[in-house]
Swiss-Prot record:
The keyword Ribonucleoprotein applies. It comes from the Bacteria. Residues 269-279 have a biased composition (Basic residues). SMART domains: Ribosomal_L2, Ribosomal_L2_C. One of its GO terms (biological process) is cytoplasmic translation. One of the primary rRNA binding proteins. Required for association of the 30S and 50S subunits to form the 70S ribosome, for tRNA binding and peptide bond formation. It has been suggested to have peptidyltransferase activity; this is somewhat controversial. Makes several contacts with the 16S rRNA in the 70S ribosome. SUPFAM superfamilies: Nucleic acid-binding proteins, Translation proteins SH3-like domain. One of its GO terms (molecular function) is structural constituent of ribosome. This is Large ribosomal subunit protein uL2. GO terms for cellular component: large ribosomal subunit. PANTHER family: LARGE RIBOSOMAL SUBUNIT PROTEIN UL2M (PTHR13691:SF5), RIBOSOMAL PROTEIN L2 (PTHR13691). Part of the 50S ribosomal subunit. Forms a bridge to the 30S subunit in the 70S ribosome.
Length: 279
């Protein structure tokens, strides 16, 4: 993938860029793997906003991705196409199995149309192949990792992300996550070799608010720009800094939201680099 920069023909085009989609080999998705996808607008079943800044955007259909890959062990598959998926930053690969089945998987970097991929404990160590962590050599870069055996991939699924297998210790495999955290995961969990493709996705400059609206992202209004009835930072004579530590519209302090005594903390070998703390 490469980034194509626009010429500044309009204010919205100035500085904006777009992916060139050179790796895409087919524009029409596999119909048997499509599902309807309705929009919530960030509302719950009572019509109340539960997640702000969501609404509108282009209509989409969901592509069913195989995140488990545990029922085709030993069955080779050919990469028929690399496709665009509007529901994620990564590209997806359409696999045609020898038994006639068709599946979508996340397309790792380097996977091309016509390649052969496989899954199972005896699979080769090459991009796109899926194996249990206990069968993967230490030092290998992987993505789409399960947290529970058979539970489906949960870690490293977005464009350009990857995890390194740094050690094996009894029933556990130690993984270094993109955040820097080193974590134990059950060695029976599966992972896919390589890193997720489309790594330059993060370098795209969207250029104008309208392109974000096409994605279904609504504006984020600063609290200091609101009235005091709407936000704790609102009001004041002239422009102000808010006058207190940053909080949400409901007074919740900004910072870490993860519970400090989570059950899975015992699996963390080394913490990630510390972020903002709540005061």
């Amino acid at each position: 993938m490469a980034i194509r920069n626009y010429k500044p023909t309009t204010p919205g085009r100035r500085g904006s860029s777009v992916a060139d989609f050179a790796e895409i080999t087919r524009s029409n998705p596999e119909k048997s793997l499509l599902r309807p996808l309705s929009k919530s607008g960030g509302r719950n079943n009572q019509g109340r906003i539960t997640t702000r800044h969501i609404g509108g955007g282009h209509k989409r259909q969901y592509r069913v991705i195989d995140f488990r890959r545990n029922d085709k062990d030993g069955v080779n598959a050919k990469v028929a196409h690399i496709e665009y998926d509007p529901n994620r930053t990564a590209r997806i690969a359409l696999l045609h199995f020898l038994d006639g089945t068709k599946r979508y998987i996340l397309a790792p970097a380097g996977l091309k149309q016509g390649n052969i991929v496989e899954s199972g404990a005896g699979a080769d160590i090459k991009p796109g192949n899926n194996l249990p962590l206990c069968n993967i050599p230490t030092g290998t870069v992987v993505h789409a990792i399960e947290l529970k055996p058979g539970g489906g991939a949960k870690l490293a699924r977005s464009a350009g992300s990857s995890v390194r297998l740094v050690a094996k210790d009894g029933p556990y495999a130690q993984l270094r996550l993109p955040s820097g955290e080193v974590r134990n995961v059950d060695a029976r969990c599966r992972a896919t070799i390589g890193e997720v493709g489309n790594a330059e996705q993060s370098n795209i400059n969207w250029g104008k608010a309208g392109r974000m609206r096409w994605k279904g992202v609504r504006p984020t209004v600063r609290g200091v720009a609101m009235n005091p009835i709407d936000h704790p930072h609102g009001g004041g004579e002239g422009k102000t800094s808010g006058g207190r530590h940053p909080v949400s519209p409901w007074g919740q302090k900004e910072g870490r939201t993860r519970h400090p005594n989570k059950e899975s903390d015992k699996l963390i070998v080394r913490r990630r680099n510390a972020g903002k703390k709540r005061k």
